[in-house]
Each structure stands twice: as C-alpha cells, then as structure tokens.
Regions:
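Alpha-helix capping/helix-boundary segments
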Residues: 9-10, 39, 84, 104, ...
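Anionic, Ser/Thr-rich low-complexity intrinsically disordered regions
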Residues: 25, 58-60, 67-70, 80, ...
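Short beta-strand scaffold positions
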Residues: 34-35, 79, 99, 118
Length: 139
C-alpha cells in the first residue's frame, strides 16, 4: 500500500504530539511512503518553529533533525512537475485549498497513493472528495 504523508503528519513522526501514534502506525503499515519535494523544507521549517515556540527543547533539536533526515531518506519523493503543478492549481480552485495543501493533494494523486495521512481538516476533506482513503492524524 502506498501511503502519502503531508507535512503535518510527517512532523508527528518526529515530535511527539497528539496524532503521533496514528502517524507512526500509518508509516509502519505502509509498503511505500510518498511525499512531495516540498515536504522537506516545510518539515525543517516546522522543526525550527517548534524550537522557537518551546515545543521542542533545544537539547532535542539535533536528534529531531537526524530523525527527520532518516525518515526523509525512506520517502519516495514526488517531484513538482508541470503536470503536478497544474493539478495543484485545479485542486486549489475546486476544493478551496491553500497552495501547499493543493500541491500535497495533487502529489498524492500523482503517486497513485492508496491513502493520505494528514492533520489538516480541509486537506482530509479534499482527499476524500478525490477518492483517496484518509488517515486523520489530528489526534
């Protein structure tokens, strides 16, 4: 089974928070994990923000980054091609998604994902509308 992770779910693999158990289970059960190229800079930014906000103590920052890098190495990366970009534009218009969420949805469809794991209500709704199974990592 191909499971697509958006950044909100991927970060739950690195930082223990509500939804982490669900995200870890989805990762473990997947035959293949896919994500778009944008996930990496988004995840790095998310780690930095967690550090600034005090959700990630400074003493764990290095280990968290190493965990992120190790997980990223196991991801089948979906590149943002012209086709994916255009599909993302369509998804943004059709489903009222923000730009990056639309890219994640288009990338999941492009990867022929069986399920999308995320913690964003609008993206979960749009994925269901596109016929994808979803794993709700909000809690």
């Amino acid at each position: 089974m191909i499971v697509y992770f958006d950044t909100s779910a991927f970060l739950k693999l690195v930082i223990a928070e509500p939804g982490s158990v669900v995200a870890v289970r989805a990762w473990t059960d997947a035959d293949q994990v896919a994500a778009c190229r944008l996930l990496y800079p988004e995840a790095r930014a998310g780690l930095a923000q967690a550090r600034r906000m005090g959700r990630l103590p400074a003493r764990f920052a290095g280990a968290s980054r190493r965990t992120l890098e190790a997980l990223w190495a196991d991801v089948e990366v979906v590149e943002i091609t012209l086709h994916v970009g255009q599909a993302a534009g369509d998804a943004a218009e059709q489903h009222g998604l923000r730009g990056y969420d639309a890219v994640h949805l288009a990338s999941a469809v492009h990867a022929s994902a069986d399920a999308l794991v995320c913690a964003d209500t609008d993206l979960l709704r749009a994925a269901l509308a596109c016929g994808l199974a979803v794993v709700d990592a909000r809690s």
